[in-house]
């Protein structure tokens, strides 16, 4: 019987079969035959090694400069030196009049600024942090521990106007009592209901070494009124995830290897720099060990002493020197080897750059930012790299920093309204009926890094003139609040007029000249080839 011809690939497999998904196969040449990872949920993969993984990340951040720089980049680009509020209650949904809502917004922002950035850290129950420092710490902890815990507390002993305080809680203190295994409804210190929603958290009271307390406290997720009793911020990647995964998991092995590699390379360079030259002998292994482990006999019969005396006598007689350049003669069988450090790199720089690029990709930052090396990058490449990193930082600001900030602000606003410290305008819903509408806010952090300040300003002004942007968005990119800038400009303009100073016209003329030059055709500004 004649068979129907079938097209096959290089392995003899029918072509139609080879065109299907091959991720579950052995791979070309069998490379994936032993790659058999189990299909696990996020909690099943993360929680058994959570404490060890976080401890390793802590160690890297404390003792590795690259890891410490990665955390600092998250703090500086996501938060910056001041985390400013732009309060935006949903006044239409709440049924407020726009003019009344604007006055209410101004009063809330002024009161929040005084409370949040107090000079003695009044917002912190420990008295150590301002609000911005809370957010910076939270972003840093989220980078190397994967989550943030902040506990709102009520201070009944304070003499300050507001009694709401916050307590930073280390993720290392949140665990199943006694560091036990837990169960379906108690996972790594988090109690969950049948839907996976957190119900309560178990916190070790004191994790200080040898403190001897070992007591665990159960803190509910929220109080009966709906006020949060524990703020838990992390970005889940899968259904049913209970705890956050730190960002160093994917690059932890490379970071540790790079650390060891750099230390070994440094030791090698130090050894080569310590010795200008060495004299190598052609003693065989047996004789060398015999001399080194000379038998405990009389001085004259000790082989180690005898050979050293011969070497000493020879070199004393023949005056072998290196500083004087001339080396007349060596002991028979010896060899002079000069130690040079010129070849100490041996491809190390290229390997280091490759590892740093891998680590930077895993941490969401650019290679130039992580290594602080801008020597091999052009303007276009630097701006493209900075824009990619900026997009990542903006996502982290929105879903991590701003989320924590808004929840902290909501706890404070609840007290301010409930105790009548701030009188809100008439609304159809009270705070407890529409908590999100009352607490809605945008947050202004660090501005975008300007590669070329002039071009950045030109782009911003052109967008505003073309109706593609606003002063609010443009100044937010610079890390500024447009309302503060406008108020300051009004004050400065009035002071200049009062002092008899005219407006500096040269600023506008210089700017218009720069705009005109930037709009010239490229061939007019570039010298032609002859």
UniProtKB/Swiss-Prot annotation:
GO terms for cellular component: viral portal complex. GO terms for biological process: symbiont genome ejection through host cell envelope, long flexible tail mechanism; virion assembly. Its main location: virion. One of its GO terms (molecular function) is structural molecule activity. InterPro entries: Phage_lambda_portal. Keywords: Capsid protein, DNA-binding, Viral capsid assembly, Viral genome ejection through host cell envelope, Viral genome packaging, Viral long flexible tail ejection system, Viral penetration into host cytoplasm, Viral release from host cell, Virion, Virus entry into host cell. It is found in: Virion. It comes from the Viruses. The keyword DNA-binding applies. The keyword DNA-binding applies. Proteolytically cleaved by the viral protease during capsid maturation. Belongs to the siphoviridae portal protein family. Forms the portal vertex of the capsid. This portal plays critical roles in head assembly, genome packaging, neck/tail attachment, and genome ejection. The portal protein multimerizes as a single ring-shaped homododecamer arranged around a central channel. Binds to the terminase subunits to form the packaging machine. NCBIfam families: portal_lambda (TIGR01539). Homododecamer. Interacts with the terminase complex composed of two small and one large terminase subunits. This is Portal protein B. The gene is B.
């Amino acid at each position: 019987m004649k068979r129907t011809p079938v097209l096959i690939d290089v392995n003899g497999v029918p072509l139609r079969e080879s065109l299907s998904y091959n991720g579950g196969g052995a791979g070309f040449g069998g490379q994936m035959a032993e790659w058999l990872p189990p299909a696990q949920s996020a909690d099943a993969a993360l929680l058994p090694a959570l404490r060890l993984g976080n401890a390793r990340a802590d160690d890297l951040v404390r003792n590795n400069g690259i890891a410490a720089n990665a955390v600092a980049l998250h703090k500086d680009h996501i938060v910056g030196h001041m985390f400013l509020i732009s309060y935006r209650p949903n006044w239409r949904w709440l049924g407020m009049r726009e003019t009344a809502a604007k006055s209410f917004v101004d009063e809330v922002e002024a009161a929040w600024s005084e409370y949040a950035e107090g000079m003695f850290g009044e917002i912190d129950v420990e008295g150590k942090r301002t609000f911005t420092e809370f957010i910076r710490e939270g972003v840093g902890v989220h980078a190397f521990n994967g989550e943030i815990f902040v506990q709102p507390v009520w201070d009944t002993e304070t003499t300050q106007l507001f009694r709401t305080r916050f307590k930073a809680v280390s993720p290392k203190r949140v665990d199943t009592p006694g560091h036990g295994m837990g169960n379906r409804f108690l996972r790594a210190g988090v109690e969950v209901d049948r839907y996976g929603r957190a119900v309560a958290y178990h916190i070790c009271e004191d994790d200080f070494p040898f403190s001897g307390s070992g007591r665990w406290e159960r803190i509910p997720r929220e109080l009966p009124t709906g006020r949060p009793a524990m703020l838990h911020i992390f970005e889940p990647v899968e259904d049913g995830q209970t705890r956050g995964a730190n960002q160093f998991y994917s690059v932890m092995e490379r970071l540790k290897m790079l650390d060891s590699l750099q230390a070994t390379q440094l030791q090698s360079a130090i050894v080569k720099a310590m010795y200008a030259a060495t004299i190598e002998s052609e003693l065989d292994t047996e004789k060398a060990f015999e001399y080194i482990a000379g038998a405990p006999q009389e001085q004259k019969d000790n082989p180690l002493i005898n050979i050293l005396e011969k070497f000493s006598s020879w070199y004393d007689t023949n005056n072998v020197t290196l500083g004087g350049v001339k080396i007349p003669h060596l002991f028979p069988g010896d060899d002079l080897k000069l130690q040079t450090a010129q070849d100490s790199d041996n491809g190390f720089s290229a390997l280091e750059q490759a590892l740093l690029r891998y680590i930077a990709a895993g941490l969401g930052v650019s290679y130039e930012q992580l290594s602080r090396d801008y020597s091999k990058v052009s303007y276009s490449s630097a701006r493209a790299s900075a824009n990619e990193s900026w997009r990542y930082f903006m996502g982290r600001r929105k879903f991590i920093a701003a989320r924590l900030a808004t929840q902290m602000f909501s706890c404070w606003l609840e007290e301010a309204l409930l105790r009548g410290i701030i009188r809100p305008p008439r609304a159809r819903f009270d705070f407890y009926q529409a908590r999100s509408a009352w607490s809605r806010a945008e947050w202004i952090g660090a501005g975008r890094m300007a590669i070329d300040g002039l071009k950045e300003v030109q782009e911003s002004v052109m967008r505003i003139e073309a109706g593609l942007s606003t002063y609010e968005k443009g100044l937010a990119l610079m890390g500024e609040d447009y309302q503060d800038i406008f108020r300051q400009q009004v004050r400065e303009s009035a002071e200049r007029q009062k002092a008899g100073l005219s407006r500096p016209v040269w600023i506008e003329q210089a700017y218009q000249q720069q705009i005109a030059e930037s709009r010239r055709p490229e061939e007019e500004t570039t010298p032609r080839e002859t």
